[in-house]
Amino acid sequence: MQGLRTLFLLLTACLASRADPASTLPDIQVQENFSESRIYGKWYNLAVGSTCPWLSRIKDKMSVSTLVLQEGATETEISMTSTRWRRGVCEEITGAYQKTDIDGKFLYHKSKWNITLESYVVHTNYDEYAIFLTKKSSHHHGLTITAKLYGREPQLRDSLLQEFKDVALNVGISENSIIFMPDRGECVPGDREVEPTSIARARRAVLPQESEGSGTEPLITGTLKKEDSCQLNYSEGPCLGMQERYYYNGASMACETFQYGGCLGNGNNFISEKDCLQTCRTIAACNLPIVQGPCRAFIKLWAFDAAQGKCIQFHYGGCKGNGNKFYSEKECKEYCGVPGDGYEELIRS
């Protein structure tokens, strides 16, 4: 389960494509006696199929990703965190999905496009695999449907792969639109893939830029250093993609999310909160209160407790924190300085 957020990015792309979507879809039945609590935890997204023709444009770039499902901030939500490689960078996406009166059916609404996605858990044994179907309806293109296969481990039995294929075919997804993705390993948000210099140079020399408006063009940063861009307001850019990115808000001294269109924009644009904070925060963050935030991810991080004059560990909920948040004790001590314990005061501003 790469999650409804990632499904949404795929399905809404159909709004801009002239496709022949499935005119009718069979009624989707959820897993019998569905247990919400048993679907929580970590999953690997292993395969995808869709009636959306946009999938064929990116199939060679797709790989196995991870998804963590858990209780949401309210009783009516499910929290999702998806981590994947994208364009050589490890990207993390978070979101919240709405429960319905049907156990095993969830909704995700995107106000920008006025679209509501319906997602169904159609087959699962909870301990090994799960198959999701997600459908979208638009006035211009009718219905589209996407199938996703998830596993508790990066590999599944051949019989389960065939079961997924059968489910996808039965809802009108063509065989050449079913993709079993390669496993490139797990990643940490903000990490970049290591690429030999010769290959990187060759790619820059021979690969054309993608067409304007594709939603995948590089940022325009001019001559600014990345840290100099931290004082800029975020820029969505003119393209119509919907990539969740982070920007540094100097007023709140926190990294916050925004929807990046995929091209142009400016340098105050980061794949992960970690990358944003480590680039932009100032030493003033050490005097901020320690904020867990309203989400319930329970991530163990470090923060500087000004009252005690030392770095302490705390549980970060995963959203709406501030800059007083460090990813190791060493980073916290080096940044904020801890008198009397042998660490020098940090002079970076």
UniProtKB/Swiss-Prot annotation:
Signal sequence region: 1-19
Domain of life: Eukaryota
UniProt-listed SMART domains: KU (SM00131)
Site (Inhibitory (P1) (chymotrypsin, elastase)): 240-241
InterPro entries in the record: A1-microglobln (IPR002968), AMBP (IPR029856), Calycin (IPR012674), Kunitz_BPTI (IPR002223), Kunitz_BPTI_sf (IPR036880), Lipocalin_CS (IPR022272), Lipocln_cytosolic_FA-bd_dom (IPR000566), Prtase_inh_Kunz-CS (IPR020901)
UniProt keyword terms in alphabetical order: Cell membrane, Chromophore, Cleavage on pair of basic residues, Cytoplasm, Disulfide bond, Endoplasmic reticulum, Extracellular matrix, Glycoprotein, Membrane, Mitochondrion, Mitochondrion inner membrane, Nucleus, Oxidoreductase, Protease inhibitor, Proteoglycan, Repeat, Secreted, Serine protease inhibitor, Signal
The protein's name in its UniProt record: Protein AMBP
Alphabetized GO MF terms: heme binding; IgA binding; oxidoreductase activity; protein homodimerization activity; serine-type endopeptidase inhibitor activity
Covalent S-S links between cysteines: 90-187, 230-280, 239-263, 255-276, 286-336, 295-319, 311-332
EC number: 1.6.2.-
Organism of provenance: Mus musculus
Residue numbers binding 3-hydroxy-L-kynurenine: 52, 110, 136, 148
Family indicated by similarity: In the N-terminal section; belongs to the calycin superfamily. Lipocalin family.
Transmembrane portions of the chain: none
Glycosylation sites: 33, 114, 214, 233
